[in-house]
Amino acid sequence: MSEVIGIKHNQHIYDLCTADELGITGDSISFDNSQESLAIIRHSCAHLMAQAIKILYPEAQFFVGPVVDEGFYYDFKVNTKISEEDLLVIEAKMKEIAKNAYPITKITLSRKEAQARFAHDELKVAVMSRIPDEKLSIYTQGDFEDLCRGPHLPNTKLLEHFKLTKIAGAYLGGDENAQMLIRIYGIAFADKQSLKDYLFTLEEAKKRDHRKLGQEMGLFTFDEEIGAGLPIWLPKGARLRHNIEHLLTQALKERGYEPVRGPEILKSDVWKKSGHYSNYKENMYFTIIDEQEYGIKPMNCVGHIKVYQSSPRSYRELPLRFYEYGIVHRHERSGVLHGLLRVREFTQDDAHIFCMTSQIKSEVNQILDFTKGIMNAFGFHYEMELSTRPQKSIGNDEVWENATAALKSALEENHISYQIDEGGGAFYGPKIDIKITDALKRKWQCGTIQIDMNLPERFELSYTDEHNVQVQPVMIHRAILGSFERFVAILTEHFGGEFPLFIAPTQVILIPIGEAQLEYARILRDKIITQSGAYAELMDKNESLSKKIRLAEKQRVPLIVVIGAKEVESKILAIRDRREKSQYELPEEAFIATLKTKIGEVSF
């Protein structure tokens, strides 16, 4: 049985020091790779790293060192520049310290005592200014101490399997006007194999990085002259998007959704009415037109509400399903922008459903079925998280209970695995978050299904029921992909750029061996485009055959057709299928027909 390193009580994790101090009992947390255990291991590893840095750079001052999804990090400052190469030196010092088997102990101080103790450390003063408590805690190991809430391991000797992964800059407290600190990230596990597996995945993730592949494959770019976080879709990337949009549009049509479009900018008065102005203003962009303030939309919901309000509504019309590939703008700090995953302009596969309370379950059932079709088409495993009523919320108990019960029932009827985030819903209604797992077993938050009782009330939406009474509808916000930008980034990394045939930006590439085959290759390309609907390209560069094939391979085109004199004469094509890793021959007409069938057999 592995060593006990903490206690879980009322969903909170306590280390042994704190549990003993507060007299807390609960479920034991063993030294393993459980989520609770890793939270303790990685927090202690952050302190181990800080101790090593303090020994190597005595002038070092530390801000915060939390556990995050990708491990842990510490923000700090020193007088000298630290590079990637220095991480190995810091790591070696960490291993040396860990072997000293220092007990990790906790000291509780009054605010006054803590302020006196760290009076000459400006970063610790900054940390304390953010803590409202009158009692503060310090953790010590050897001659190192740091202000911290915990939880921590009982001894440094338990820290054996860790790796420092990257170095970056970070503004103090995330404030772009504050000083820049150094941030070092790391990872830690309870055993050697888990660390080895993680590092393999990390290397694989670097190869699959959508920013790298996007540039290599000519999918998208960014231009500082235009502005950070504003993606430019190149022809091949736009083709990829079009292929996804085409499939999605057909599926939406079949499921009874109507296309709508709202304006890009709306008067600030309407954002005040919706609540965005008071709750989301810092994430919005504004402009003045004719002395009137307008807000560039960060969400599509208000436009769809105005579509609903464009005429009187009856219960006979409900549910109404409106969709839009809506371009939205949200202000993100430059430090958090990351390729297509985090941008300032993006397009949502957004839909809003206006329905009666009694229709919530059937509508959610349909959305879950839609989600299943999309995820299966791309080979994604997915799970869902149901977030329930928070302490601060609007609406009466009965509506909340009915809405939450409808979401639960829909999930269970569809045999979908889900977690419950108690109290994690929006103030205006419960929600389901869609989380997908990619080929590297990383989890990504994509779409969401949100029940909204707030906006229908704010905008006084109504429909006439069967008794000729005006009733407020329920509004369901629904996005399955989340945004096209984010989803394309995830797809690129999931497939490593090897997109399946049905969405590949170039589906067929024709490589004539010489000048004599060019004319036939051009005719064949046009036939493929017009008769199969596939994107076909012609490699007509004056290069050797082997180089042409290498270029096509680098572009990760699914089907490569090499055309020589024999193929021109016989009209039987030599095909290389990169996805199936096979080579075969097919008559020209049969190839085009097969291509059309393969592309057409996928639907959402």
From Swiss-Prot:
Catalysis: reaction(s): tRNA(Thr) + L-threonine + ATP = L-threonyl-tRNA(Thr) + AMP + diphosphate + H(+)
Pfam families cross-referenced by the UniProt entry: HGTP_anticodon, tRNA-synt_2b, tRNA_SAD
Region (Catalytic): 209-500
PROSITE patterns: AA_TRNA_LIGASE_II
Cofactor(s) the protein requires to work: Zn(2+)
Cofactor binding notes: Binds 1 zinc ion per subunit.
Matches recorded under InterPro entries: aa-tRNA-synt_IIb, aa-tRNA-synth_II, aa-tRNA-synth_II/BPL/LPL, Anticodon-bd, Anticodon-bd_dom_sf, Thr-tRNA-ligase_IIa, Thr/Ala-tRNA-synth_IIc_edit, ThrRS_anticodon
Domain of life, source organism: Bacteria
GO biological process terms, semicolon-separated: threonyl-tRNA aminoacylation
Binding positions for Zn(2+) per the UniProt entry: C301, H352, H477
Principal EC category: ligase
Swiss-Prot/TrEMBL keywords: Aminoacyl-tRNA synthetase, ATP-binding, Cytoplasm, Ligase, Metal-binding, Nucleotide-binding, Protein biosynthesis, RNA-binding, tRNA-binding, Zinc
Oligomeric and partner information: Homodimer.
Protein family membership: Belongs to the class-II aminoacyl-tRNA synthetase family.
Function: Catalyzes the attachment of threonine to tRNA(Thr) in a two-step reaction: L-threonine is first activated by ATP to form Thr-AMP and then transferred to the acceptor end of tRNA(Thr). Also edits incorrectly charged L-seryl-tRNA(Thr).
Protein name: Threonine--tRNA ligase
Annotated gene: thrS
